[in-house]
């Protein structure tokens, strides 16, 4: 009996010691994480387009702020933004953050590819992120989106709402990421009616609204009644021209990009819909993994419809029921892979409209990127 008592007592003491040790270790891990979280610093380098461009740059900034709020971070303390109008400026700013040992350094946009590739090779102990670009380096994560898929849905919506059978596309520049929008959009229009004409114009700039107005005026003057703008701050000029025409009694529409641009069409109400990217999701995932010590350098993340990373805006005020039904049907078919949206000229030239399969298609959990 006495022997049995000592056995039980010994087991109890060992168990208690083990639990105390585990609790202490967990507390230490939690304390270490909290300390790291408080001191975490992010450097963000943007191009010459303003942060409040009401489009891509603002979508990125809003995503970083959203993550910051989750961690009680303060602007200028935990996350800092600087502008880099030129490639030389970009390299200088990226290097500055690396030398100051910032935890993550973001370069925003396709134009930062060369600068990040060069600085990441020199500053190998620093971790970099490029949004809307690809840099294949072991200390760089590339966040990209399947823009062609959301653009395809925008094409479906445009084709179902045009009265003139003439639709416009205004791009900022002819880089591969903007061309994805163009080819996806044209494929969507073609899937509804191959006879509809899509007229394309490029501004060769992302920061001149007056150029956007000029191109929009030209397209609307050619009997185009819907324009899909993918031109950053330049695209705001498309809204300006559309609102001007709406005031004069002409019914025209604009399709926004990257974030819900419904407000940009007010008060004249000219935003048909917007092709959005969930930039906040991509940004949050990379920051969270870095915080947990799991920065996945070398990965190229691709967010598409399957990953709930792109689509049309939730605001459907200006889309009729038939349009919403068709958009949802095509979206479901892209999700399952029944419809493969073209993202370049070669794919587009070989694209043939596919009749969507009907019926409810369940969402599946998937891994993002490679």
What are these regions (language model features)?
Residues 17-21:
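C-terminal motif of bacterial Sec signal peptides marking the signal peptidase cleavage site
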Residues 9, 22-23:
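Serine/threonine-biased, Pro/acidic-interspersed low-complexity stretches characteristic
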Residues 1-9:
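Bacterial N-terminal signal peptides that target proteins for export
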Residues 24-370:
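A residue-level marker of the well-folded mature domains of exported/periplasmic proteins
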